[in-house]
Amino acid sequence: MAEQLEQYDPSICGQTRLALPTTGPMMVSRFPRDMVSLLRCNIDSGELTLTKEHRVAGEGVLNALLHCRICGAEYRIENGIARLLSDQLTLEDKHEMSIRDTVDYDFTNPKPFVPPTEGWRSALSDRLEVPVHLEALQTSASHTVLELACGDGRFTSLIAGKGARILAADFSINALRLLALRLPAGARVARVHADINQLHLPSRAFDRVLTLTPLDSRDERMSMFRKIAQALRDDGRYVGSFEHDDLNRRFLGLPLVRRYSKEGILIEHLTMKSMCLESGPYFSTIRVRPIRPRVPLVAKLPPILAYRILRLTAALPFVRHFGELLLLTAQRPVRLPVEGEYRSGSRVAKGAYRSYMHKKDRKASWGEELV
């Protein structure tokens, strides 16, 4: 089956449509048909619809053609991944995408993930970082979740295990391929190959949004916050983590903007104040707190002892600012006013005014506006 998938060319529309098995690992790779409605055109945000399906698997799609209802632009689903990546990428984006595909998420010989002994994907780091994200997100099986910069599924697989539907986007195609291998059976995950800076989303369509990407400029982050606020439902919740300008960096006078490694990915370290200022215009309720503290020499201790010390550090005033990440939890997205849209107002005031105007045998209007 893998060999057959490699030989298939979705650009050849005359090929026979193949129905694939509806059980087993192949089902995780499909694009859920009921989540196609969440895709939008890169040009005008028009809804995308399936026009030609070349390969189907039960309720999922492996290869198909997508069509914009407004402008007619065409996109593809290839091997279960919606290919929405724009050609208009910055040089920095292209540089990062190359690193992600060739170094971080090499797909030449995929293997089960093995945590490193130290660093941000180590077992100790995950114990400090992963639970607080999931606790803040509070997902359930009834939720539709948007995950931006999903990577190889570090969080996606855990959220999918709770039964939630997930639209998972990343601009590393290899990360999305690895993601399919790491999802639990029956996971409802739609993989999207896209740049989150240019990804268009439907309004008020998601219950939860998760991001784990620093982005490298204030303008990019604020654009992302605006996009997320529009995509969230009124009672939705957004959780994101960002690199923190922590006490270690401040004490040592280290740069706010740097690369993870020489010629690596560009990142910016943020303060709690800057995080609130950037996200504040788009959410009415915001909470920012440092997580995953880094304390010199603690990592050399036995894992259980190190974990307990770092958990305590994360909870104490002042020293919690040793946290290497900032966790943002935002709710109540701010909506732009819509022309002609009435507000609830005061029922008492409206009732009294209408009664008064009725006694005068006149329409209950305020100038040109009906009450």
Task: List each model region and its residues.
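A short acidic, Gly/Pro-enriched loop at the edge of an enzyme's catalytic core
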Residues: 197-209
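Acceptor-substrate binding/catalytic loop of class I
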Residues: 256-274
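Conserved class I S-adenosyl-L-methionine
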Residues: 79, 85-139, 158, 239-261, 356, ...
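A short glycine-rich, Lys/Arg-flanked "PGG" loop and its adjoining helix->strand segment in the class I
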Residues: 222-234
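Conserved catalytic loop of SAM-dependent methyltransferase domains
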Residues: 282-308
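A short SAM/SAH-binding and catalytic strip from SAM-dependent methyltransferases
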Residues: 208-220
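Class I SAM-dependent methyltransferase SAM/SAH-binding core
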Residues: 146, 152-198
